[in-house]
Amino acid sequence: MKWYLWGAVVLLYSLFGSACSTEWRYDLSAYGLSPVENVDNAPAMARALEQIREKCEENQTIVVTLPKGRYEFYPDSAAERVYFISNHDQMNPKKVGLPFEGMKNMVFDGQGSELIFHGRMLPVSLLDSRNCVLKNFSIDFKHPQISQVKVVENDTVNGGITFEVAPWVHYEIRDSVFVAKGEGWELTPGSGIAFEGDTRHLVYNTSDIPVGVRGLIEVSPRLIKSPRWKDNRLVPGTVIAMRSWERPAPGVFLYHDVNTTLENIKVHYAEGMGLLAQMSENITLDGFSVCLKGADDPRYFTTQADATHFSACKGAIISKNGLYEGMMDDAINVHGTYLKVVRRVNDSTLVGRYMHPQSYGFEWGRVGDSVQFIHSSTMELIGARNRITAIKAVDQPDYRGAKEFEIRFENTVNPSIHEGSGFGIENLEWTPTVLFSDNLIRNNRARGSLFSTPRQTVVENNVFDHTSGTAILLCGDCNGWFETGACRNVLIRKNKFINSLTNMFQFTNAIISIYPEIPDLASQRKYFHSDIVIDANEFITFDRPLVYAKSVDGLVFTNNIVKQNKEYPAFHWNNYRFYFQRVIHSKIENNYFDEGFIRERDVLEENNGYDI
């Protein structure tokens, strides 16, 4: 089989090479880009990329180079675009620093450059492009919207916390309220994440904390007393990232692309996700990181949300050799989006709606796409698969900005599917295979990784180090986030889990949490997830729960090593190594537990009368 694969690679290489026999090189310094401090490179970059795009042809490769340096970009003169981006606030228009659009066979090489952005911007976008590589640069913002402070004193007797504001944070105390400020924005933080000052781990059993930003007394510049802030867990030296819940734009945005590689890119901050890819095919991340600037970086945080996020993509997603740390959500999230059925027009036509306020306005499906239908209360499939023969936006001229689509199907839709009982439509065409390997995930909020795709998913050779919540989540939800779908082929092998689950967040029932949202589990007769193998991993943990699973047909846990420590007190409500709800065809064999394994003590099975 390897010889066949190698032959296919050689054939593809020869075809691609013959199609792109001419190489054109463009040095962006010739277009006026300058690494001089306070020089705005946004207009020159926009002009350069537009001129280069016009020269893209099928039979040539374009290499665009940026001489190594520190380049600044300001929003006022940047390219302006209307983008509807999955899982982000739909704030438009957006100011884009590097708008790559309509590119073919293009390599952008930053040669180690630092790209520094001001205000609120979308740093890099790649749209409607094919066979493109972005590599060798970093993304950061001059004034992040997250305000970092350090606890100097905590009066646990009388109450009140005194904190020091990091030197790069612009702020004022306005009518005794902390107001963070930047170019074109200001906000008062509403929540915070607490980090241990010496280790950078999230503080044990804190999760999202309220922050004392009102009724303040400024003792001296950058030294502030908050008399009402009472939290004994925040000892002096604790570093707190005070934040809002806004996420206007990611660091990198991919849309309608085919065959994209992101290589040796570091995102140090973005107000949304590090990378958001939607409706794109075949994406490779190699050395793409959302990370600090090394061990001496005074910052403790990176992105406001997920490090990487893939919504309604297809082909292969490969993510390897990355470092993900300090972000406020998952290192990777792969899913599609259910449309909720809001009207049955006739027996072959339905109207479906995007339901989450951060997920609408982008293309959902195309003629010929295969779909299936699901009952949201039980998450069971209803009727047979079908195929789209026509799709149009209902509330907009086209899909841009649309929330509702009228969809005509090839065959009659099951008569039980209508607007009254909660049904979702899942697009099966836009579902990828996933390889997530050789990554380091550490010191982040929420979860380490999240996968919701029916195609093969392999998670291997990763280190999940103090991910604070669940390390791996297999989800599926047609009720809140409306993120598809069922996992049918998952292999989790040769990973190392170090003290995950020091905090509680959504869906964090164990280190590996298989947690579809099923409101009426008691009425479910089928199973949502299937064929999940957890093999040859090492778990180093202070607490009990290893695997939680709900509605699974086929779960294997073999050849794993479990080591117990006392680095934190056990606190999780789940006291079982394995907690199964409606799980059949499960196997737990050939594992090593340094404290032993007793099935009656370590396994809880709730199957509602179904056989195990």
From Swiss-Prot:
Lipidation (N-palmitoyl cysteine): C20
Enzyme Commission (EC) number: 3.2.1.n1, 3.2.1.n2, 3.2.1.22
GO molecular function: alpha-galactosidase activity
Key word Glycosyltransferase present: no
Placement of PbH1 repeats on the sequence: 431-453, 454-476, 487-536
Signal peptide: 1-19
One GO cellular component term noted in the UniProt record for this chain: plasma membrane
Keywords: Cell membrane, Glycosidase, Hydrolase, Lipoprotein, Membrane, Palmitate, Repeat, Signal
Name of the protein described by the UniProt record: Alpha-1,3-galactosidase B
Topological relation to the membrane, as annotated: Lipid-anchor
Entry's family note: Belongs to the glycosyl hydrolase 110 family. B subfamily.
Lipidation (S-diacylglycerol cysteine): C20
Catalytic activity entry: Hydrolysis of terminal, non-reducing branched (1->3)-alpha-D-galactosidic residues, producing free D-galactose; Hydrolysis of terminal, non-reducing linear (1->3)-alpha-D-galactosidic residues, producing free D-galactose; Hydrolysis of terminal, non-reducing alpha-D-galactose residues in alpha-D-galactosides, including galactose oligosaccharides, galactomannans and galactolipids
A Pfam family matched in the record: Beta-barrel_GLAA-B_II
Function: Alpha-galactosidase. Removes both branched alpha-1,3-linked galactose residues of blood group B antigens and linear alpha-1,3-linked galactose structures.
Cellular compartments annotated: Cell membrane
